[in-house]
Amino acid sequence: MPSSLRETLLRDEGLHLKPYRDSRGFLTIGVGRCLETKGISMAEAEMLLDNDLREAFRVADHLPWITDLDEPRRNVIYNMAFNLGVQGVLGFTKTLELVKQGRYVEAAAEMLRSEWAKQVGNRSERLALQMESGLWR
């Protein structure tokens, strides 16, 4: 028997960690949070961003040499990990090897030859320039 409103709502609404359509067809997540009518707050968006950044930073667990890069170049890899997931960015084996060797112009060109570059457009061009130059873009 539920002993709080929280427990009752969890029972009645259920817990959904991925978006779903509720009984009226509204996109919903969590415990009955209607994304279409309520959305999320700024604090919730920042919390999600912080969680996603922590996940992106885990790329360093697989690339210990990343800490030797200057901040702008290191953040190119983090940005890509944020977008693609850690495993996705680890699939850029040639690019990452070129970065590790300090061959940034070639690494940037390799980034731009990828399917990812076609998908994200200007983002890839900006990040490739940042990788090449070591300057924030």
Predicted regions and their residues:
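Mid-chain, well-packed structural core segment of small domains
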Residues: 66-93
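Conserved interaction-surface patches within small, structured recognition/assembly domains
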Residues: 60-65
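Short hydrophobic/aromatic-rich motifs at helix boundaries and adjacent loops
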Residues: 29-31, 66-67
